[in-house]
Amino acid sequence: MQPNQLKRPSLNHRFEPYTLKHLTICKRCEKEIIGVSNSAQICYSCKNIYHTRCCKEIETKKLELICLGPPKKIKTVWKIALIPSLFKSLFSKSKVIVNYSQQLINEKTFTLEAIKIWVDVMRVDNDRYIQITKYYDIFDEEVFNYIINMIIEKDINLPMVNIEFPVDLHSSVQQNQYINDQAVSQEQKQQQQQLQQQLILQQQQQQQLQQQQLNESYDNSTINNLNYSNDISNAFSPRSVFSALELSSNAQVMNALELSVPFNEDDNNDDSTLSASTYNRRNSNKNKNSNKNNTSSSSSAPASASSSKHSNLNESFSSSTTAAAIVNNIDNSNNSNNLAALSPRSTASTTTTTTTTTTTTSPKSNNHHHHQHHHQNSKSRKPSTIIINKKKIKSPKNKSSKRYMLTEQYKWSTQMIGLQILYRILFNEKNMIHFLNDKFMAPLAVLYPILINRLKAISLGSDNNNNNNNNNNNNNNNSNNNNNNNNEDFKLLSINCKLLISILNRMLDFETLIPLFFTNKVIESIAKVNSDRESLRGKLSKDEFEVMDRVVLLLGKYFHLEPYHSLIERRPEWIDMIINYSVEHKVGILHHEITRNEVKINVEIYDSPLCTVYSGVYNGMDVAIKEFSQDGMGFDWVSFYKEITIVSASQHPKVIKCYGAHTKNTNKPFIVTELCSRGTISNALNQIRKTTGQPPAIPLIVHMAIDAAQSLEFIHSKNIIHRDVKGNNFLVNENWEVKLIDFGVSRFVEARLGYTIVGTPNYMACELFNGQPYHQPADVFSFGVVLWEMFTQDTPYKNLTRIEQALFVQSGGRPTIPPTVPTTIANLIESCWVQTPHLRPTFTEILKVFYSLLTPPPDNEHLVPVVTRLFNSSIIQLKILKYLDTNTLLNCGLASRQLRYNLYNGISMEKKTFSNFWIKLMNFSKSKFRYELLSPSERKNDSTGSSPIIMCIQPFSPNSQSKNNNNNKNHHSDDIIDDDDDDDDDKTYPSLVIPFSASSPTLNINSENKNNNNVNEDKTSDTSSNSNNNNNNNNNNNNNNNNNNNNNNNNNNSNNNNNNNNLRQNQFLGNDLNKSQDNNQLMDGSGGRRDRSRSKSRSRSASPSNNHLHDKSLMGLLSSSQTSEIGDNNTNNNSDNEVDNNNNNNNNNNNNNNNNNNNNNNNNNNNNNNNNNNNNNNNNIDNNNNNKDNNNILSSENNNNTTVIEQQQQQQNVTNNNSNEPKNSNNEPKNSNITNNIVNPNVFTTTTTTTTTTRTTTTTVYDGTGTLNNLLFKINDGGIISSDSSNSLSDPESEEYSMPIKRSSSIRSPGPVSAISPLFKSLSPNLSPIVPNIINGYSFENTSACD
């Protein structure tokens, strides 16, 4: 490469925003880029990553940084043998084991037990390796599992740290373990209290002699009782064990508990880790100080070169039974012997010992102590005594004891080590595979709220910067030490919390695994902490709150998609978080943004100082446009965003439907809702009185009251209080349906009840006038006043002023109920405005009263209302799933709500019909994730798994009324490995229900299959021919049969047997059709005369290939044509020949001619083959005649039901039959009309056809009134179903028939809606054979995906 190409100007950098998934160092400033904030830019030429601010400086100041182009790819191969080097490089940066990392971890000692002991003993509260080490692209599964267990098991499973050692330890170490095991005994608690009292008395009386008194007290009470030996092996604390001992390759480290923490002279912020240089300096200072004070004797033997390496860090130790500091008087004669015994590689050396004291000195010694600290902070240090601060942290076991089990803090440090390692892995696809296990993900997510609760329990205090106050007053000393310890615990916990939420945040980058995050409590845990974020102000960083906000945005993104909508809707606190986020950031995340050009404003309907309402047109619909002015009185963006978010989150048939809002770059925002032309309730009822001269009918008022009560019941179920229930906030549309509006003053129920007086005085409850806290019963009181208005058409308190009205209501006064109101309604109104709030009924109870008025108990117990029958029968529920995309769902009707409820129950509850629903959804997402890891070449050769396609339902999509794109796309087939051993059709799932659906395997027709004896060739050709014309199918079938006859005579003999069986099968099919006609159940919407492709799908569904004959036949009515898996040859031959026989129903003469021609060809080849083929033809003729008789019976009974389109199809068939003659004289199959890829019709794919037609089918539906109403359904090429009660064809391009599925690049076209029918078979595989008799009158037309 030339030099001028190497040195390119800075303008050649192509900076683009980059989302960090690992720790990165900026190329310019060489500082760490925080992965949480995502403030990074990447140059796609040189692949270097910079801070955003550094990129701006490069561009503005025109800094000439060299862009070397794409870097060379260096392939790094990691092996299991390199993992010890990984741990060694990670922890060699630690200040604790600078000189001992080589001895601890190597290839010989790399075991999980060694890592467990090593990592547990480590203390890295504030270590340097956090900024130095890199991220790792290797993670062995065994090590990953161990680290996860190290993080979670001590909090999720075990209350304390318990380590099992493989071999016996040293005797002195066992004694130390005995001290820790007996730490919580009651006897030692009493000893601790006695020692505390003795220390207080001794400190007050003899301050100058306290050092000697403490030594005597310890020697008499602690050392003698516990046989504590003074040797070097006692230095077993996590902070000093590696500084005191040199471990051999097979040495075992003891996990002992250190319960007294030395004051760090080097750094006030780090009192838990010690470096080698700090240890040497401190040891020399202690030696000088001990010689100066003459507190201990020391040997004069010179120290060797390794004495600093093996010298003892003279920290004082204390078990949890002692409250005072423990002074270690170490004998010189025992030090070298024990050191040599424990460390074989160490040389004999003498160690100078010191006595560490805890003193409370006089003012004179205070000044001296202050002078020492002054010099310690300078460059030249003078010897000084070490002040040991006693640990006084509240114990989780016994808070009153003021003691602290160091296992908690020790455990947190262990967690931090594991979290640091986990935080440093590259969160790429290779490493994320380990997180697909819910066994690890769920406990890791649950751990975060546990750590947050501990963080909240810690009370922060000011740091103790003045040591003089500690020495003057013992009580102040204890409290300040408590604050210091709390601050230390808070610092340690805050690091763990930040690491853990950063790990969870990186997982959320993989949106393919979103279903997994809803299941394994990742989203639930973060949302739970976010709901209590006010109490965490000051304890969590800004980056952590940004991660919580990201989860809220994720909930808003998936709110309109099923099944997430049902999951989110069941959590009112999640909806509350979405609303609070919209209010806080002044942004709407649930509504659809509408521009001003998309709406057409017509006339003004209503005007007030707050807003102006216009009637208009949006997307071809009559809508109401509620416009605000930013300069208007009382306008507030916070209230505006709150209203549109609550309306978007509260979509219900009885709540005003919101189509979107205009909020960006405008001074006059507006909200687009459905138009209610009749105005408010009072206006609509008064209009009846004016036009008819009579009061409104009571049944009409009851129906309107039911609508109003249903809307309030819905918002109360979401923990919303409307707070302004009045007649003007209920609008009536053209169909006399009541809709609830005006959520501007609504709010979600919080932990504390509200005291703010909000509402209209005429409707306000008495507790609001009294200033008492109010809850949802306040809306019930207001609704009682609305009922009084509806049944009296009058205004309450019209003769009273506001003050008189308030006093009247507080004293128990209510409006008078006239006798014209029915008694039941009058009693209901009186119960709604009872003075005591908790005695008022709920809206569920109110609705029961109204329902009893409309639908009294029937005399005959078998006469059940149609709604009850509809939603209590699992079979009918499955049938309704076929119509998921009709206008009923678009309008959010009762069926939609119930269906979504059933879907939610199938996800969240254990039911037999939905037992594997969510599990299969998880498998789909995991399979998609693993499939994306494959290279393009590997994907082509991959036969085990493929990428599922995202498909979700949008029941409440803001733009659900927009026009639908009817573009047919060819989709690749998917084959997902299913671990469940269920039925044969377990690979087909409801794509409209499952967000990640997969299709069945694709059958490819290759040239090598032409001469194959397998019957699959017949099946393939038959299926492919369905998309073109039927006569060519017969030719291809006959040609293929000729090939088989020429190859093998036995093949023809088997076909003869199968054809004989087909005679009985077709006879059964004809009888079954006759029975269906007698029962007035239209098996096919065309009156029995159907095209060949539809009769194919029908006959294949009704094939009695196994013992579940009735189940299979019923499945043919409920589901589309399905390509079953290839079983044994006999079964396949039966099904294929049966299809061939049914294809002959329309054109028997042509089929016979084709058969004769093919037989002539066979005679020229082989006489034996000719005989076999003649037998085949004879059997086929018999079968065809039998089928012709059956079809004649059907056609004679249904001649009047033939539609215009069917007549055209018949004429077209006749034309095709006349023009279709066998042109292929050879024995090769005719493949001109055979498609290359045959897609399973169970999935949302459509077969391309030469002509586009619109067919109409008549479906009989029982409406509960005792009559059968015929609904006309129209299905166009895009699979759009529309209904029209007038039995007239309407425009297929009209907007009112559009589907509610949002189109995007990642979501494929759904195809025919009836493809949802595979759900029936997966949900209820064993349907009762008598179901058609039970659901008389409920017959639904089957629409095949291949039609």
Swiss-Prot record:
Name the keywords, alphabetized: ATP-binding, Kinase, Metal-binding, Nucleotide-binding, Serine/threonine-protein kinase, Transferase, Zinc, Zinc-finger
Coiled-coil annotation reads none
- Map out region (Disordered) in residue numbers: 262-316, 333-402, 463-485, 937-1241, 1282-1310
- Keyword Metal-binding attached: yes
The Gene Ontology CC terms held by the record are:
cytoplasm; lysosome; plasma membrane
Q: Where is the composition biased (Acidic residues)?
A: 976-986
| Residue spans of biased composition, Polar residues class | 271-282, 1063-1083, 1118-1127
Record-listed E.C. numbers: 2.7.11.1
- Which SUPFAM superfamilies does the annotation name? Cysteine-rich domain (SSF57889), Protein kinase-like (PK-like) (SSF56112)
Q: Which residues bind ATP?
A: 605-613, 626
Q: Which Pfam families does the record match to this protein?
A: PK_Tyr_Ser-Thr
Q: Which InterPro entries match?
A: C1-like_sf, Kinase-like_dom_sf, PE/DAG-bd, Prot_kinase_dom, Ser-Thr/Tyr_kinase_cat_dom, Ser/Thr_kinase_AS, Ser/Thr_Kinases-Pseudokinases
Q: Which family does it belong to?
A: Belongs to the protein kinase superfamily. TKL Ser/Thr protein kinase family.
Q: What is the designated name of this protein? A: Probable serine/threonine-protein kinase DDB_G0288147
Q: What is the lineage of its organism?
A: Eukaryota, Amoebozoa, Evosea, Eumycetozoa, Dictyostelia
